[in-house]
Amino acid sequence: MSGVFLEAAAGAAGRPAGLPGRGGQPGLAGAEGGEGRAGPGAHGDGVRQGGGLQTGGAGAAARHRGAVAPTKLRCGGPEGCYYARVESLICALHGVSSLYVCRACENYHVCDGGDECIVVNTGDNMVCFLTGNCVADNIQDFCDLNIAVKKKEMECAPTDDYNTFLGIAEAIKKDIFTFFNREDGKLAEIREAILTEGGLRPEIGRLIEVTLRVSIHIFSKSDHGYDVICSMYVQIIISIYSTKTVYNGLLFKCTKNKRYDSVLKKMRELWMSTSATGGCAGAAAAD
């Protein structure tokens, strides 16, 4: 950013450039001019160039051109920099959400999954260690390197932490129960098929656990993975247990994304085969 732009921005907050300061001398064009103080020439501290003495705004401009801002050191110590997302009007205008700054040393970091990011695989997502920002969508090659190797395991088995898997399954069951337990005449047929007074029927809960094993990896693919999976279950249940169409604009948008079409198809096929065989298909998938 040029010095002229900076001086103009600073002068905009004070009086206009070119108005005289005290003592009849030209005022500074920048912040000093805004306060109405006399230019450096009035006090005899102008800048000499070519044997002459430049006063007022000319002296300030000469000093500005010759000044070099000292380099700021990054935060030391074991904790290092603490980054926060830059939230400004220009970032919002251009949709920039990957710019971070350390408030202490003013060091900037572009968190876009590039070489400066320290990427950590948390099991649920790919996260930059410096900012905590999820960068999985920006480092496709890196993700493929880690995910494609165990693609079959991720599609057919729960996460490494089985307790986490069960917790996710229970959360989905509660949300599915809440969704279909509403006072909606169009959902009455489905409520009778999948709900009891206190929750989902046991066989429905078991089907959710079995089919979740082929969709659990979506959590590492999308920032809204949980919502996508819940939407998948809503569509699967409606398509199987309803004899009439009850879709609306608020339901299930993930079929518009081809990446999830194959996952949805596998979930529905596994749901149907497990329901028909009494769990044999689910046991085979778990193996």
UniProtKB/Swiss-Prot annotation:
Chain intervals for the UniProt region annotation (Disordered): 13-58
Start-end of Gly residues biased regions: 20-58
Superkingdom in the source lineage: Viruses
InterPro entries the UniProt entry points to: Herpes_UL92
Family: Belongs to the herpesviridae UL92 family.
Protein name from the UniProt record: Gene 31 protein
UniProt organism field: Equine herpesvirus 2 (strain 86/87)
Lineage, opening ranks: Viruses, Duplodnaviria, Heunggongvirae, Peploviricota, Herviviricetes
